[in-house]
Amino acid sequence: MKNVLFVCVENSCRSQMAEAFGKMHGDGVINVYSSGSKPSGVVNPKAIASMKEVGYDLSQHNSFGLDEIPQIKWDYAITMGCGDECPMILADNREDWGLPDPKHMEPEEFAKVRDIIESEVKDLIKKCK
């Protein structure tokens, strides 16, 4: 199994949804975690509502900083598009998905970002098989 870390600034929207999709689609292929460089401490209610639409309860997730996740060897570190605010994570493979932060988007636009994240996570899982 590959260890995958999804990182954004607040660990409240994009990285949380990526972790959720990793858990939904990557069982037995990837171990997933998410964190933020400046964690908000809460998961965005819009992310919770958006993930509920696809059958995942994100309300049980917590927002973590980099110092609160396991210090393990990362096979993949995926940043969500947070530019200089995302720290350098040591990993065998690094990718930046360049996603807009949906926290101020309307539900329809938020769902588009969610769906892009799901597609990217599925592609990553294929690479890890």
What label would you give each PLM region?
Residues 18-20, 47-49, 77, 91, ...:
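A sequence-composition feature that detects small, non-aromatic residues
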Residues 11, 51, 77-78, 117:
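Conserved small-residue
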Residues 76, 82-129:
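Phosphate-binding/catalytic loops
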Residues 36, 40, 69, 95-96, ...:
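Residue-level signal for alpha-helical context at structural boundaries
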Residues 71-73:
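Alpha-helix C-terminal capping/helix-to-coil transition sites in glycosyltransferase folds
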Residues 59-62, 75-80:
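Short amphipathic alpha-helical surface micro-motifs
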